[in-house]
């Protein structure tokens, strides 16, 4: 009898110890790593979500910009952080699904990171320079087939989502267009406006002002539905290329080993922040659709994205460091 009582007491103490951290969490400031410089889409999304999280938990949420290597450096810093819930990150598709497939990064997103929630998706849009004689996808594909190897597409860098979206276009449409990589979206945009390159995939909010001003011509949007801010632009499905649907996405992650009860608290706080109307409004301006799913669903989503882009990389023969 004493043995049974001792076991029951010990088990109760273990349960109490396991739940205590979550009951007290968060008791101090949370550091939210953004693996990109201030001012970009990743940074804006993180700041809007982080500010509301801070108001919910009555604790500061410090934004820590750790830009470099397309989001890899900041994500590496997160993977090495103490797994106590006080250091988290909102990272992107590039750092969580593409770079680990192409580069020798110091983390495995599925083993070294703990999924918390998929925060938002932002569709990629295909645009052409105004001197390109194509007003829609059918005309663009016909032009490329008539001039194999003569048309080109810009990207924000080798292995970036815009790069792989361009490679996916080549595979899907069976066309030969040349990749022209840049060091970031801004120089790619400058040369698009200067008609030095002919087409590019980029996040919708980056392109929208230039489409409105007539500086670029929209061809298709890589989203399931048309964007409220650009209803005149058809989706890739509407133009007959559903497999070309391409969205940048941003997810909240913690270091692997973060206790499940703390992950649950982080998930609850983040998803609650995403339900606030002002948060939705601010991020809708950025072209972002808020998600807010479970850790398990986000982990499965990351797996599917890694598989998808690994296949594109292989099928397109994209050079990798691995």
Where are these regions (language model features)?
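Mature extracytoplasmic/periplasmic domains
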Residues: 276, 280-299
């Amino acid at each position: 009898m004493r043995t049974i009582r001792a076991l029951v007491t010990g088990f109760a103490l273990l349960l109490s110890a396991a739940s205590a951290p979550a009951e007290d969490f968060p008791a101090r400031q949370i550091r939210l790593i953004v693996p990109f410089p201030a001012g970009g889409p990743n940074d804006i999304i993180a700041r809007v979500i982080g500010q509301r999280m801070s108001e919910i938990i009555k604790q500061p949420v410090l934004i820590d910009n750790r830009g470099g290597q397309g989001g890899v450096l900041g994500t590496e810093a997160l993977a090495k952080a103490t797994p106590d819930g006080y250091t988290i990150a909102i990272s992107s598709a590039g750092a969580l699904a593409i770079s680990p497939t192409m580069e020798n990064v110091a983390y495995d997103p599925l083993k070294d990171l703990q999924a918390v929630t998929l925060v938002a998706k932002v569709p990629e849009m295909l645009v052409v320079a105004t001197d390109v004689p194509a007003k829609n996808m059918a005309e663009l594909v016909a032009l490329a087939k008539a001039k194999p190897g003569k048309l080109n597409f810009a990207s924000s860098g080798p292995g970036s989502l815009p790069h792989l979206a361009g490679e996916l276009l080549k595979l899907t449409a069976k066309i030969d267009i040349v990749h022209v990589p840049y060091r970031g979206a801004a120089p790619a945009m400058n040369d698009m406006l200067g008609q030095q390159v002919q087409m590019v995939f980029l996040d919708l909010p980056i392109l929208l002002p230039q489409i409105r001003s007539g500086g670029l011509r929209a061809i298709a949007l890589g989203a399931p539905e048309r964007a409220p801010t650009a209803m005149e632009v058809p989706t890739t499905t509407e133009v007959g290329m559903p497999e070309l649907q391409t969205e940048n996405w941003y997810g909240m992650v913690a270091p692997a080993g973060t206790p499940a009860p703390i992950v649950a608290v982080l998930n609850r706080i983040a998803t609650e922040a995403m339900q606030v109307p002002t948060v939705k409004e601010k991020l809708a301006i950025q072209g972002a659709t808020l998600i807010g799913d479970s850790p398990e669903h986000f982990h499965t989503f990351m797996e599917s994205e890694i598989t998808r882009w690994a296949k594109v990389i292989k099928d397109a023969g994209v050079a990798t460091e691995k």
